[in-house]
């Protein structure tokens, strides 16, 4: 498997490679669905079956002999990290394609900045077959002019009048995310269902804010082209119906499917440096004092408003006391066994950036039914490069989910290696784990990457 240190510049992406032997590393519903444990959605099963054939051919090209039954399930994770993560993940995928490794990936999962990259890629049908061209289109867009204020305000009004719950997520998506990704992406995930049979299966991770705050229930929430739901609890709804109103498992009021711009808006909360920065925001979001949290969100929103043109400020201030990512709870008042009671009680739930809790989407691929053999984690986090993986290991231990031991020495902390391979076969389903340290700096040069 190839490990690397990423040196990310806005005008180029360069790599330092450390090679090892790849063969060594590879040792729509109208109601809510809850499937039996160890059973994927039928559409995902079909996708995975087809993708595994692609993986098998890719392994053969790399001179790795493998039977169809023994094809490894490999997941690539992209962490948060705002623009650093967006550019870093794009560069990583480009290099993997050049090395013949991209077609070995079964799942591609991301949080925060990595999802901005994913959203740009999955706009293009079968993007992995023309990645160099897609990369140039992304670079050209990011180097070009931003979204006009007129278009942004029109989109904000469309969000406001188009659904029951209009929150700060809509504001962030329209007024902040568009300033970074330089577009208003109105594609939806369900439109992608038949467009990516040659690409890895995409998973976008967020968290349930109420479950996070109460430390009860399942906070780990995932969204893919087919369904949205709780990764560990195993309760899902068709992605096209996520956000619609449900009662006892039946849809009673339809809401239009969210678009990709809105989804990217869920990925910025922990990335901005307003009113004291990321650490202060996360600390505030973790507090049990709801009044303090509301005051902080108000000041946070006001800071955003002050950075914007005077046009639309009044709209922003009206939203200063509002919340993030509110949707109807598709599990509201459901009955039956094996459904966490804490998820059934409220009519609405709030879904926010997963980076607030864990800055990489481990739990989307640690579902036992996905049977992952190898996890490749690209960490673009700012600060301690080991914090996320250590937090993931600790959480897995508490939840009794098989996860390799992560032993970081004092020398590693002073001088991280390019990558780490963790594997301790204590359990049948323990995946081999590869952690890649992505050291990144960002600078500007002639508005090019």
Question: What is each model feature region?
Answer:
Residues 52-105:
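Helix-rich "cap/lid" substructures immediately adjacent to catalytic or cofactor-binding pockets
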